[in-house]
A protein has these predicted regions:
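Glycine-rich, small-residue loops and helix-cap segments
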Residues: 3-6, 20, 79-193
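Gly/Ser-rich, acidic/histidine-flanked active-site/gating loops
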Residues: 1-47
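Short helix-loop capping/hinge segments that flank enzyme active sites or metal/cofactor-binding pockets
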Residues: 32-102, 139, 145-148, 178
Length: 193
């Protein structure tokens, strides 16, 4: 059953053909934040075997069978192409420009124009992190080659209760989540598991 049919079955009124406005996207912003936040999280938990992004990269470099099923492109890009701090002038300027475009000229204009409570996007979208608006990604199914995919629910500023209700209702109706399979992996050796 398609994700949109599940939503209709749950009572959603769908508005089709709402094209997301072109949002200025600079993925380096997300990479800066990813590295900074991941390092901050890892450093606060002494039980974890890896305490930095670099240590995770080194671990998977030494143990590719344990976790390289999906590659390390984003990890490497964040580690080696950003400082890991959000004080770089380029980061600050790019983030401000992206947020202006995504907020007033982008998502809010689209949601107001179509009277939307929640915007639903197939897969992962960068419109929410760029805008700073709340979002939730929930499982929606699997591709023909058994790769999981989800739908992203994006809300208006401070609309978390509405967003959570919509995403939770969909998730309960779709029942698309499957526990991950760790074939032949000793989870005691994988950081964070």
């Amino acid at each position: 059953e398609g994700a949109y049919r599940v939503m209709e079955r749950c009572g959603a009124i769908l508005v089709q053909d709402t094209n997301l406005p072109h949002l200025r996207s600079d993925s380096s912003i997300l990479l800066y934040e990813f590295k900074m936040c991941l390092n901050a999280y890892l450093s606060t938990n002494p039980a974890l075997k890896c305490r930095t992004l670099k240590e995770i990269i080194d671990f998977y470099g030494d143990h590719p069978k344990e976790g390289l099923k999906y590659g390390m492109g984003i990890l490497l890009d964040a580690e080696y192409n950003t400082s890991g701090t959000c004080t770089d002038p380029k980061y600050i300027l790019d983030k401000a420009a992206c947020q202006r475009g995504a907020q007033e000229e982008g998502l809010l204009k689209l949601m107001d124009g179509h009277k939307l409570d929640v915007l639903v996007c197939p897969g992962i979208t960068d419109c929410s992190p760029i805008s700073g608006y709340p979002s939730i990604i929930v499982p929606a199914g699997y591709t023909s080659d058994n790769m999981p995919f989800g739908v992203t629910f994006v809300g208006r500023p401070f609309s978390e209760p509405t967003l959570i209700r919509a995403a939770y209702s969909f998730e309960q109706a779709a029942r698309a989540r499957r526990a991950p399979e760790f074939e032949g992996i000793n989870t005691d050796t994988v950081p964070g598991i």
